[in-house]
């Protein structure tokens, strides 16, 4: 276990600046969005959007969300967190293992007193720490910005909803990253894992967000998309506990299944010299 924690520590120190830059960068974008909301008339925006065709509004969901500062922020930040950070996490997950195979250093790593389970487990542990810390920095900056905003203070600062949204974002991004990690244990190739991981991400986005425009007979395809189980508006604006519990449970199961699957496949995998 000493080697396990040592490996996690090495990866954290290696990526520490990336964590700060990414978390701080997304947090800065959030700060500007909060400042923008401060100067906007959200009610007027709702009136404008109400004139749009019904099919267009289905993509945004409840129109009243646009008139709520938390709703507008969630749509601008959390609904696109997969784009701001998810793609980078997919790339990181794809390269953590396969990079060592391609550089012919994996035999040296496995020759140390560490099992394959612990070796891959240390990289998966780092991946979740990476996601949790990056998103944690982003959420802290966002919370500070909201606490300083008169509009958000008037609406109320809901720490429990914010915490719920944080855990859902971590599990959502963790699931997207673990899809790429699972693929990387099969192909042991950064290019293949990244390409497939990003392709699956966009396919899931399409299925999870645009199923409402599909024929009713095939709309059940939405259930295979990770995006369908990520509904931050329902947590932050509507405080819908039932949907939150459902999403957290299913995302948790997906994460665990991908972790276990990755460990089993890597343990049985023949590593090329």
What are these regions (language model features)?
Residues 89-93, 141, 175-179, 226, ...:
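Hydrophobic/aromatic residues in alpha-helical transmembrane segments
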Residues 31-34, 67-78, 121-176, 180-181:
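Secretory targeting signals
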């Amino acid at each position: 276990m000493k080697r396990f924690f040592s490996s996690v520590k090495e990866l954290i120190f290696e990526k520490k600046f990336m964590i700060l830059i990414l978390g701080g960068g997304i947090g800065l974008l959030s700060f500007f969005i909060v400042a923008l909301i401060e100067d906007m008339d959200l009610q007027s925006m709702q009136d404008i959007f109400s004139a749009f065709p019904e099919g267009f509004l289905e993509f945004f969901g409840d129109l009243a969300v646009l008139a709520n500062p938390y709703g507008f922020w969630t749509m601008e930040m959390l609904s696109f967190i997969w784009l701001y950070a998810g793609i980078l996490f997919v790339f990181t997950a794809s390269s953590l293992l396969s990079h060592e195979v391609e550089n012919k250093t994996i035999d040296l790593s496995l020759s140390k007193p560490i099992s394959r389970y612990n070796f891959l487990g240390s990289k998966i542990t780092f991946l979740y720490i990476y996601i949790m810390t990056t998103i944690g920095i982003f959420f802290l900056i966002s919370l500070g910005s909201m606490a300083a905003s008169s509009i958000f203070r008037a609406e109320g600062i809901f720490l429990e909803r914010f915490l719920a949204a944080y855990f859902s974002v971590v599990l959502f991004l963790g699931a997207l990253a673990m899809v790429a990690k699972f693929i990387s244990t099969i192909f042991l190739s950064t290019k293949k894992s990244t390409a497939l991981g990003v392709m699956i991400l966009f396919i899931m986005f399409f299925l999870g967000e645009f199923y409402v425009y599909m024929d009713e007979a095939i709309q059940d395809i939405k259930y295979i998309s990770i995006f369908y189980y990520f509904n931050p508006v329902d947590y932050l604006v509507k405080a819908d506990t039932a949907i939150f519990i459902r999403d957290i449970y299913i995302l948790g199961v997906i994460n665990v299944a991908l972790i276990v699957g990755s460990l089993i496949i890597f343990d049985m995998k023949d590593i090329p010299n």
